[in-house]
Amino acid sequence: MPRVVVPLSAPEAADPSRFGAKAANLAALVQAGLPVPAGFCVDARAYRIQLSALGLEESARGVFSSEDRPCARRCALETKLGLMQGAIVPEVREALLSAWRSIAGEGRPGVVRSSALVEDRAGSSFAGQFQSYLELESDEDFLTAVRACWAALWSTRALRYMATHGLDCADTAMAILIQRLVPAGAAGGGLSRTASGEMLVNAAPGLGAAVAQGEVVPDRYVLDRAGRVKESALAQKYHALSCAHGRRAFSRALFGAPCLDAEQLAELALLMHKCEEIVGGPAEIEWARDDTGISLLQARPLAVATAQVPDEIWLKHPGLNGHPSGIGWGEGRARVVNCECELERVGPGEVLVTTVAGPALSEILPHVSAVVAELGGSTSHLASLARERGVPMVLGVLDATRRIPDGSTVAVDGVSGVVRWMQ
């Protein structure tokens, strides 16, 4: 019987049908000699063993098979809580702890990351729809994180995403990544190819979660194909997500300091070129830098759009610049929303103007013509979802909720990163 937990360096780890595309892509990077944190991947079979042992298979099948919505919600909740609270099957638990103790624990923090079989594929990235757990140190916390990753397949957010893509949770499974935590001094993402043929890097101090969740405006670097800096926009840095279980404040002297130098950017460009070879085309990456250098945390296929020429009428109106998602042109009535509780105010075809563009907004993407956000960058999870759906988005647009009048007509260029409006 195949092993349920295998190191990323094992040839079998590159099988997406067992370990999901996220883990399989990382395994391919490891086997190509690229810098990836040490770790293991957990076969999706472990999830299926657990589901069966807990008697949850019938509840799982009832989520999308039932036309009774209250019944479907009850089935989803039963499955989620069962996976979260149930004891892990002994043979699976033993294999998990053996892998975990070899790379983390006893003061060595580790991470547990989702790698669903439907994740990180072309057309369904699931960016930000599942969970990752950082800075885990004890066996108990590790096992809790594993159960939480399995249960995340049945979260409301994931179920909605699957429904819009015609997927059924009962037909898929959750594999898992176990890795050493990179105590990052800086982290972010990168796009190996933009609409204009350049490369793009986002960076922020500390761990990369703040960039992925769209909670900060990151540094933005545009590189040529040789990795030389063509353009840079440095963000103001007030705090960083650190490995000390919180945020650390910055001294005023570091507010505008770059996160990366030219040599580090050239190294990232080279790594993105190699990732393109492995994923078979343009790639989107996540990375982190500590005292030992740059590590790759993720690589997935990237859809690249062509630039559009704006109508000259828009050039006469006021505009703001930001970080483009890299796809699309959209127009519509602006709907300024300051918190998620106001999303019901956003009508079909309107342009959502908001502060934080987090993955929770993914459910509204099918209904809007474009999104403008004050925080976030081109490599955030929501930007990935916007590219996937062809929704124009510009992030890091400072003062957007104050400058763009609610109800005004707005044009959003998701390729150039320009937002214009007229009364």
Regions found by a protein language model. Give the residues of each.
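Beta-strand scaffold of nucleotide-dependent catalytic cores
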Residues: 113, 124, 134-135, 145-146, ...
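Conserved catalytic alpha/beta cores of large enzymes that bind or transform nucleotide phosphates
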Residues: 202-284, 289-290
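Acidic, glycine-rich flexible loop/linker segments
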Residues: 57, 211, 301-306, 328-346, ...
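N-terminal beta-alpha lobe that positions the nucleotide/phosphoryl donor
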Residues: 1-177, 186, 263, 276, ...
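Structured core elements
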Residues: 7, 28, 111-113, 125, ...
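Terminal amphipathic helices with adjacent charged low-complexity linkers/tails
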Residues: 42-59, 241, 277-316, 418
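Short, glycine-/Ser/Thr-/acidic-enriched flexible segments
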Residues: 13, 43, 117-119, 131, ...
